[in-house]
Amino acid sequence: NRWPGFSEVASHTTDFADKLQKKLNAAVEAESEFAILEVSSHSIAQNRISGCEFEAAIFTNLTQDHLDYHSDMESYFQTKRKLFFPPYLKEKDGICVLNHDDPWISKLSSDLEKRSSLVSTKITESEFENDDFFFVTDKKFTESGSTCIFHTPREKIQLFVPLVGEFNLMNAIQAITILYKLN
């Protein structure tokens, strides 16, 4: 948790609603313009993001990591799915960035219609005829990070991500896609 004049180590991925709202208010009072939150499936299930309406949301992946909490993959997916619809995501102009490489994404992207952008680290050429597909080519992974060419609908960008691993590259390009969509 950080904003101008404040920094602390978080005790949870996403704070409980009352504490989260107090922190968001303090950040606004410190003249922060944006908040970037990691929203866990636990926090969605426990209503920790009550009172938050997001401009944008990212679907990173769905793995078996949290089956200790969720009874099965379908209920885990249904919990994560809630983030992409009201009351959490703005209904008309909320931005959705989805990991095209995740097998669960087809269940979500069809529900979102034209509100979503797809991102891939596995496809080497755009297979889509729309303005909402982002992908990478020329990936190289080293001990110091990852490099690639990031293809947007309008340009190609040489990227260096100072984090190791394909999942970190995917997380980075999804975050960059949000910034791109927000101009």
Regions found by a protein language model. Name each.
Residues 1-9:
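Walker A (P-loop) phosphate-binding motif
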Residues 8-40:
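Conserved nucleotide-sensing/catalytic segment adjacent to the nucleotide-binding pocket
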Residues 9-14, 53-55, 113-115:
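Short, hinge-like loop/turn segments at secondary-structure boundaries
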Residues 24-25, 46, 81:
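Short hydrophobic/charged patches on amphipathic alpha-helices used for structural packing
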Residues 30-32, 56-183:
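Acidic, Mg2+-coordinating active-site environments of NTP-dependent enzymes
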Residues 40-43, 101-103:
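Short beta->alpha connector loops
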Residues 43-50:
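Conserved helix/coil segment N-terminal to the catalytic DExD/H
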